[in-house]
Amino acid sequence: MSAASANSVTNPSAWENSEIHPKHSYSPIVSGDLEVPETEIQLDDSPTGPNDPVRIYRTRGPECDPTVGLKPLRAQWIDSREDTEEYAGRERNLADDGRSAQRRGAASLEWKGVKPTPRRAKQGKRVTQMHYARQGIITKEMEFVALREHMDPEFVRSEIARGRAIIPNNINHPESEPMIIGRKFLTKINANIGNSAVTSSIEEEVSKLRWATRWGADTVMDLSTGDDIHTTREWIIRNSPVPIGTVPIYQALEKVNGVAEDLTWEIFRDTVIEQCEQGVDYMTIHAGVLLAYIPLTTKRITGIVSRGGSIMAGWCLAHHKESFLYEHFDELCEIFAQYDVAFSLGDGLRPGSVADANDAAQFAELKTIGELARRAWEYDVQVMIEGPGHVPLNMVQENNELEQKWAHDAPFYTLGPLVTDIAPGYDHITSAIGAAHIAMGGTAMLCYVTPKEHLGLPNRDDVKTGVITYKLAAHAADVAKGHPGARAWDDAMSKARFEFRWHDQFALSLDPDTAIAYHDETLPAEPAKTAHFCSMCGPKFCSMRISQDIRDMFADKIADLGIPQVGGDAEAGMAAKSEEFVAQGSQLYSEVRDNAAHA
C-alpha cells in the first residue's frame, strides 16, 4: 500500500465524523444502561405552528479512529453470561492473506489496533441468541433490538426462538450494535464490498464500509477475493458497527491457488474457524448444491451464476460425490454454535437471467436448504435463506411463498431480484423494482445491487448509489406492509413539500446532498430556498402554490362545506358535522323541496 493510502486510513475524511445534513443529530433512545442509536431530524415551524422532529433508524455507529477501531459495546454483556471462555485460537499464517502476501512475506497493511483474544462457548454450552430465546431468556441484544424496532422484547424473543428472525452477533465481534432480520421487522439491506485480484486495497475497503453504513447499510458482506483477505477482514470487523458476512469458500479457494478440485473439508473447516475467531457474524454456505441438481442447469441460458455455487458444482463433478459442505453440515452447525455465527444458506443455483427463473434447479436447491435450516435449528444455530437473482415481476411472489413453506419461515435474504436483463449500468434500478416487490411479500433483507453489477467492481460512489436505492426499496415495502411508524417519514416530507420548506425537504431526503445539488442547478440563490416554487413549473404554474392560494382565497367557502383547512382542527370540524347530522335526525338522505313547484 502506498504512503498516501495508509495516511488516508490514519486520517479519515471530514465526512466520516459529520452528519449527512446539518438538521440531523445523534439522538439515542436511553433505557436503563442501554443507549440505542437513532437520528433526529429537526424541522422548521409551519405557518400554523411547530413541527415535531422526525426520528429515523441509524446504522453508522459512533465516531472512531479507523486505526484503533470501535469500542466493544457488547463485551460486558457477553462476559456476564459466564458461558464463554477465551482461548489461544488457531495460529495465523501468511496463506490466510493469499498468494501475494506469501510472495511478499507480509500483508500490505497489518492491523495495528487491539485484536481481541478469541472466545468460544464453554464445554457443553451453546451461546447463540436462538438458544437463549428458546430458554425464555431475553438478552441485552434482544432488549437493544426491541428498542431499536419500537417492539416488545418478548415479541423479539419469540420470533428468534421460532427461527423467524435472527440477530447475527458473533461473540468475537463485540463492537457490533445488535440488529434483527425478520419479516415482522423493518426490511434490512446489505451492502457488498471487498477487493478482487484486479483492484482495490485495504484502505478503499475500510472507506467503503464506513461509507455504506453512513448511508444506511444494515449489514455488510466482505467478498474479498484478492490480496490480504484476512487482514482486510480484520480492519473491516474492528471498524464495523453492523454485522459482517462472508463467503468462506472464496478464501479457502485462494488457499489452494484457485483450483476448485483441490479444496478439502479440512482446509474449509480451518478457514471457517479462522473467520469465526475474527468475528464474522454470518457466513454464506452453499451446502444445497447437490450432485443430482447440477444436470438441471444444463439447459439454462446462463447456467450457474453464483461464484460459490459454481465452485462447489465444479468440485462435485471433479470428485463425483456430494460436496463436503453438505456431508459435513452437522459439524459446521457445531462450530457455528460455539461462536453464534448465523448461516446464510446460499442459493448456489439461483437464476442468472429471467429466462431461468423459478426452474427445477433453483427450487430443488431451495427445498434442500429448507431441510438444512431445520438441522441447524437442532443445534440452536440461527439461519437465513438466500434467494434470487433474476426473476420476472409476475414470478416474484412465488419465491416468497415457497421459501416460507419449504424453509419454515426462516428469514429470506434476496439479491434483488432483477426483473429484466436489458439494463447494464442501471441494474440498481431493475433490481430495486423486484426488491420492493419481494420485500412487500415477506422478504426480510435485500442485498443491494450497484450500477456496476455485471460490469465491474463497485467504487465508493457506486456503493452509495446502491445503498440509497435499496433503502428506498426497503422503505417502500415497509410502508406497503403498514409497519408501525414507517409512513411518518413520508408524511413529514409531504407536509414540508406542500409548505415549501425546502431545507426540511433536503433534510428528510435519503440523500440530502443530491437533492440540494439538483435544486441548486437552476435556483442556486439562498432566497430560492424559501420560494413557493421550483424550476420545474416556475412561480405561475406551481400546483401546490395554486392549491394553497385556493385555500387562502376561498377559506370561508371551504369552511361552509365542513372541510377542515390544512393546519386547522380537523377533529373539531368532524365533531361539529357529527352534531349537525344527529340534530337533523341521523338520516342519510333528506327530502329536498322544489320551491318553484310549491310557489
Swiss-Prot record:
InterPro entries: ThiC (IPR037509), ThiC-associated_dom (IPR025747), ThiC/Bza_core_dom (IPR038521), ThiC/BzaA/B (IPR002817)
One protein family per Pfam: ThiC_Rad_SAM
Necessary cofactors: [4Fe-4S] cluster
GO MF annotation terms: 4 iron, 4 sulfur cluster binding; carbon-carbon lyase activity; zinc ion binding
Keyword presence, S-adenosyl-L-methionine: yes
Enzyme class: lyase
Keyword 4Fe-4S: yes
Cofactor note: Binds 1 [4Fe-4S] cluster per subunit. The cluster is coordinated with 3 cysteines and an exchangeable S-adenosyl-L-methionine.
EC number: 4.1.99.17
Residue ranges, compositional bias (Polar residues): 1-16
Family per similarity comment: Belongs to the ThiC family.
Protein name: Phosphomethylpyrimidine synthase
Organism: Corynebacterium diphtheriae (strain ATCC 700971 / NCTC 13129 / Biotype gravis)
Record lineage: Bacteria, Bacillati, Actinomycetota, Actinomycetes, Mycobacteriales
